[in-house]
């Protein structure tokens, strides 16, 4: 038993360390710790979404591939002409990248699949609880949210919502970091009001429909 516990514990610890590292990287990206990196991701995402709003996805992908090929082919021809003029033999300009190992190992794939599967199973379980009314209040919240989304969908399309989502994702963390105390205060007030209303609703429900005590 002692021999098998070692590899398992090291596998779990390495997986948790990897998840923490990726979480910190995303946090740094959203909080603009590296302005250049965050700006590139934000700008690239916005350009892609705005392109999808104006053109079809097939056109956007085609233009992206053509742009990339234009850059790489032009650079390849330029280096070849330069080597011919200077009579040098530096080889293929992209040789270091071509020789770089970009294969996905089975271990990395298995770790990513395991982590994703845990989130998927949790989401499926929660969705089943909502649709089968395990908690009436939570199911009513979902119904209210979907009813509001029908009005949102009548005004905005999916791409517009994604653009707004990206804008909020890259601006809300900075605003929260700057006005954390004030925002936490108002969020606490709203949470207290929602909790009070929820408790009143649950108190008026029949016993079989009340939220199960854990």
Curated annotation (Swiss-Prot):
Task: Give tissue specificity per the record.
Answer: Expressed in the animal hemisphere at the four-cell stage. During gastrulation, expression becomes restricted to the prospective neuroectoderm. At the early tail bud stage, expressed in the head structure. At the tadpole stage, expressed in head and neural tissues including the otic vesicle and optic nerve.
Localization terms from the record: Endoplasmic reticulum membrane; Golgi apparatus membrane
In this protein, which residues make up the domain named Reticulon? 26-214
Entry's Gene Ontology BP terms:
brain development; endoplasmic reticulum tubular network formation; negative regulation of amyloid-beta formation; neuron differentiation; vesicle-mediated transport
Query: Cross-referenced InterPro entries, in alphabetical order?
Result: Reticulon (IPR003388), RTN1-4 (IPR046964)
Give the start-end ranges of region Disordered: 1-21
What GO CC annotations are associated with the protein?
Answer: endoplasmic reticulum; endoplasmic reticulum membrane; Golgi apparatus; Golgi membrane; neuron projection; postsynaptic density
- Give the UniProt keywords, A-Z: Endoplasmic reticulum, ER-Golgi transport, Golgi apparatus, Membrane, Transmembrane, Transmembrane helix, Transport
Q: Which Gene3D superfamilies match?
A: 1.20.5.2480
At the top level, the lineage of the source is Eukaryota
Oligomer and partners: Homodimer.
Alphabetical list of PANTHER family matching this protein: RETICULON-3 (PTHR45799:SF4), RETICULON-LIKE PROTEIN (PTHR45799)
Query: Would you tell me the protein name for this molecule?
Result: Reticulon-3-A
């Amino acid at each position: 038993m002692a021999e098998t516990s070692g590899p398992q514990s090291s596998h779990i610890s390495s997986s948790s360390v990897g998840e923490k590292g990726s979480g910190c990287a995303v946090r740094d990206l959203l909080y603009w710790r590296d302005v250049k990196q965050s700006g590139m991701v934000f700008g690239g995402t916005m350009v892609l979404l705005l392109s999808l709003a104006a053109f079809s996805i097939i056109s956007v992908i085609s233009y992206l591939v053509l742009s990339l090929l234009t850059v790489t082919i032009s650079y390849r021809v330029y280096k070849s002409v330069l080597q011919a003029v200077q009579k040098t033999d530096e080889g293929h300009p992209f040789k270091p990248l071509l020789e770089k190992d970009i294969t996905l190992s089975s271990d990395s794939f298995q770790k990513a699949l395991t982590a994703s599967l845990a989130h998927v199973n949790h989401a499926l379980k929660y969705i089943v609880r909502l649709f089968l009314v395990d908690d009436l209040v939570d199911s009513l919240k979902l119904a209210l949210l979907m009813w509001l989304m029908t009005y949102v969908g009548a005004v905005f399309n999916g791409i517009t919502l994604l653009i707004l989502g990206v804008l909020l994702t890259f601006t809300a963390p900075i605003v929260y970091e700057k006005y954390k105390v004030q925002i936490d205060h108002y969020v606490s007030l709203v949470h207290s009001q929602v909790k009070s209303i929820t408790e009143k609703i649950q108190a008026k429900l029949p016993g079989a429909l009340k939220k199960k005590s854990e």
